[in-house]
Amino acid sequence: MNILRSLILVVPILCVISCDSNSKKSSIAKVAVVFQEDSLKFTKSQKVFIRDVISKSEKEVRNFLPNLPDSIKVIVEAVDWDLDIVNGVTGRTETNHPPLVLVQISHNYKGGVIESVYQGIKATVFHEFHHLSRGWAIQDNKFSYGIPNAMVNEGLAVAFTEIYTGNINDVNSYPKEADRWVKEILALPLDADYAQWVMGEHPDGRTYIGYRTGNFLVRRAMKKSGKSILELSDLMPNEIIKLAGY
C-alpha cells in the first residue's frame, strides 16, 4: 500500500518534469530573423511577411530533420543582384556554431521583394537548413575537403528542397551526361577549384556542376537503394556514393 501511494505521488512529479523539459526545448527550438540594411531597405510589412515565411519554413524543416540545431540565426539582406535563376533569393550556411544562415533577397526580381519571398525564400531556407542539419557550413565545416563531399551535400540539399517544396530550378537540373560528370568529380584532386566545379562556371562552359551532378547522384542512390531522401541525409558522402553505384 505504501509502495502504491509512493508511485501515485511520483508519477505526477515525473510528468511535470518531463512536460517542463519538453516545453523548454520547444521554446528554444526557434529561428531569429535579423535584417541587415544598407542603401536598400525592407518595409515594415515586408519584414513581417519575410519573418513569417522563414519561421513557418523552419517548423516544416524541423519536422523532417529533428536534428536541426536550436536557436538558428538568419540574417536577411536586401540586394540588387540578378538572382532570376534562383527565384530572386540566395543564401549560404555560414557557421554551425552558432547556427548562422545568410539570406539575400533581390529587389530587382520581377515583382519585387514579396514576389521573391513567395518564389524563393522557402526553398532557400529548406536548402540551407538541410546543410545545418548535416554540418555543411563555410567556416566550421564538419566534412573534409574535396569536391565529392560538396557534390553529395549540395545534391542532398537540392533533392530535399525539390521533394518537400516542389520548387524546382533549371539551374539544378542534371543533363544526360551526368553519369560522366560524377566520374569526373570522383577523379578530381583534393585541391580542385571549388568555384569551377561546384557553384560557378567551368572553363568549358558548364555551370553549377556540383549542384546538378549531386542532384543526379542522390536521385540515383534513392532509386538503387530504395532509401528516402531523409534516410540518405543520415549517411556520410562515401556511403551515398556507393549506394549510387560508384
Where are these regions (language model features)?
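Bacterial signal peptide processing site
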Residues: D20-N22
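Acidic/histidine-rich, surface-exposed loop or edge segments in extracytoplasmic proteins
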Residues: S27-S45
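Auxiliary, metal-adjacent structural segments of Zn-dependent hydrolase domains
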Residues: I50-V101
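C-terminal motif of bacterial Sec signal peptides marking the signal peptidase cleavage site
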Residues: C15-S18
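Pan-zinc metallopeptidase signature
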Residues: P189-Y246
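Active-site recognition of the HExxH zinc-binding catalytic motif
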Residues: Q119-W136, V158
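Post-HExxH zinc-binding segment in Zn-dependent metallohydrolases
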Residues: Y145-R180
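Short pre-active-site segment immediately N-terminal to the catalytic Zn-binding motif
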Residues: H107-T124, P148
